[in-house]
Amino acid sequence: MGRKKVEIKRIENKSSRQVTFSKRRNGLIEKARQLSILCESSIAVLVVSGSGKLYKSASGDNMSKIIDRYEIHHADELEALDLAEKTRNYLPLKELLEIVQSKLEESNVDNASVDTLISLEEQLETALSVTRARKTELMMGEVKSLQKTENLLREENQTLASQVGKKTFLVIEGDRGMSWENGSGNKVRETLPLLK
């Protein structure tokens, strides 16, 4: 008799959902560890629970090295896609430029008819508006990317500031505790005040 097939849908019972999450998260991390050992690969697993708690596991290299390698690889892919898109957009504009140049060369603008000049002007305006729209789109994408980076850095700064605050508090508390202890960590006995 085989295992019962479980229907994949949201578990309504909160405690059952938490237990399932915990078991499956541990299973996922174990499978990643096994894959890393069997195939000598670097694997990073990030899991965020429904409550927002982050669980992470890295095998082989540490998490930051794996993420850095991913970002470098992903940036190369994005550059290649961007170059392909620019090339695709460049060809129609190049063709339009060649048409305009040939029209200007084949007939003197002074001898061109009004209809020819109007058509030429419309083609140039169309090419210019397409170029401006693409430029605006690229600039807006860059602004969004910079805003996202700014937000990530701000969150990281807040996290680091809170960690520094906690460590400072622990150091201050530790210093207070040391005032009641001698160097060996044993408590110093208080002496009774002298009678007057």
UniProtKB/Swiss-Prot annotation:
Sorted alphabetically, which SUPFAM superfamilies does this protein's record hold?
A: SRF-like (SSF55455)
Alphabetically list the UniProt keywords: Developmental protein, Differentiation, DNA-binding, Flowering, Nucleus, Repressor, Transcription, Transcription regulation
The entry's note on the tissues where this protein occurs is: Expressed in most plant tissues, roots, seedlings, leaves, stems, inflorescences, pollen, siliques and flowers.
Which Cys residues form disulphide pairs?
none
User: What biological-process terms (Gene Ontology) are attached?
Assistant: cell differentiation; flower development; negative regulation of flower development; negative regulation of vernalization response; positive regulation of transcription by RNA polymerase II; regulation of DNA-templated transcription; vernalization response
Predominant location? nucleus
Q: What if the gene is knocked out?
A: Early flowering.
**Which molecular function terms from Gene Ontology are attached?**
DNA-binding transcription factor activity; protein dimerization activity; RNA polymerase II transcription regulatory region sequence-specific DNA binding
Tell what triggers its expression.
Answer: Requires EARLY FLOWERING 7 (ELF7) and ELF8 to be expressed. Up-regulated by HUA2.
The free-text function statement in the UniProt record for this protein reads: Probable transcription factor that prevents vernalization by short periods of cold. Acts as a floral repressor.
Additional comment: Complex rearrangements within the MAF2-5 gene cluster plays a role in the variation of the flowering time, an ecologically important variable phenotype.
Name under which the protein is recorded? Agamous-like MADS-box protein AGL31
Q: Which organism is it from?
A: Arabidopsis thaliana
Gene that this sequence comes from:
AGL31
